[in-house]
């Protein structure tokens, strides 16, 4: 009983366990197991690595993992598509401001119209950029 309690409460076991759990997953998978070096463990006949006492975490390549990746892809594409609605709101704001400006000062008709076309082009370009990002997320990743 004394040997078992000494084995469980060994400082090196606690230290290596906490180091193992605090390391990233790739380091846990790729690092070779360490052999115990404490003198208190020498009374045990079977020597096993300290990392074998903790269940090994493995990379997830299951169907659930792929479903999560697909859902994240759709969520990202949907969030990028929201920018297209912002483009529509921008175009409406540009032409609404054109009408208000023309009503206030009809003599600036040509200058206001050229600025409205510039605002329309910039807003439409941002909308197309958002749509392109959405398609890249869906089909290129």
Curated annotation (Swiss-Prot):
Site, Reversibly protonated during proton transport: residue positions: 124
Residue numbers carrying N6,N6,N6-trimethyllysine: 109
Quaternary state and interactors: F-type ATPases have 2 components, CF(1) - the catalytic core - and CF(0) - the membrane proton channel. CF(1) has five subunits: alpha(3), beta(3), gamma(1), delta(1), epsilon(1). CF(0) has three main subunits: a, b and c. Interacts with DNAJC30; interaction is direct.
UniProt keyword annotations, A-Z: CF(0), Hydrogen ion transport, Ion transport, Lipid-binding, Membrane, Methylation, Mitochondrion, Transit peptide, Transmembrane, Transmembrane helix, Transport
InterPro entries hit by this protein: ATP_synth_F0_csu, ATP_synth_F0_csu_DDCD_BS, ATP_synth_F0_csu_sf, ATPase_proteolipid_c-like_dom, F/V-ATP_Csub_sf
Protein name as annotated: ATP synthase F(0) complex subunit C2, mitochondrial
TM segment ranges: 82-102, 117-137
Provenance organism: Rattus norvegicus
Similarity annotation: Belongs to the ATPase C chain family.
Illness: This protein is the major protein stored in the storage bodies of animals or humans affected with ceroid lipofuscinosis (Batten disease).
Record-linked CDD domains: ATP-synt_Fo_c_ATP5G3
GO cellular-component term (any): mitochondrial membrane
GO biological process, any: response to 3,3',5-triiodo-L-thyronine
Signal peptide limits: none
UniProt xrefs under Gene3D superfamilies: F1F0 ATP synthase subunit C
PTM summary: Trimethylated by ATPSCKMT at Lys-109. Methylation is required for proper incorporation of the C subunit into the ATP synthase complex and mitochondrial respiration.
Extra information: There are three genes which encode the mitochondrial ATP synthase proteolipid and they specify precursors with different import sequences. They are expressed in a tissue-specific manner.
Source taxon at top rank: Eukaryota
Subcellular localization: Mitochondrion membrane
Presequence extent in this chain: 1-66
Functional description taken from the UniProt entry: Mitochondrial membrane ATP synthase (F(1)F(0) ATP synthase or Complex V) produces ATP from ADP in the presence of a proton gradient across the membrane which is generated by electron transport complexes of the respiratory chain. F-type ATPases consist of two structural domains, F(1) - containing the extramembraneous catalytic core and F(0) - containing the membrane proton channel, linked together by a central stalk and a peripheral stalk. During catalysis, ATP synthesis in the catalytic domain of F(1) is coupled via a rotary mechanism of the central stalk subunits to proton translocation.
GO MF term set: ligand-gated channel activity; lipid binding; proton transmembrane transporter activity
Membrane disposition: Multi-pass membrane protein
């Amino acid at each position: 009983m004394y040997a078992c309690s000494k084995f469980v409460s060994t400082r090196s076991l606690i230290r290596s366990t906490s180091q193992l759990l605090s390391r990233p997953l790739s380091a846990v998978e790729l690092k070779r197991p360490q052999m115990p070096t404490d003198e208190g463990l020498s009374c045990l006949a079977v020597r096993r690595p300290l990392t074998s006492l903790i269940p090994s975490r493995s990379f997830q390549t299951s169907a659930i993992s792929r479903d999560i990746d697909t859902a994240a892809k759709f969520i990202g594409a949907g969030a990028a598509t929201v920018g297209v609605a912002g483009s529509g709101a921008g175009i409406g704001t540009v032409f609404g401001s054109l009408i208000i400006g023309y009503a206030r000062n009809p003599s600036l008709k040509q200058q206001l119209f050229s600025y409205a076309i510039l605002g329309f082009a910039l807003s439409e370009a941002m909308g197309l950029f958002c749509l392109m990002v959405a398609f890249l997320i869906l089909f290129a990743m």
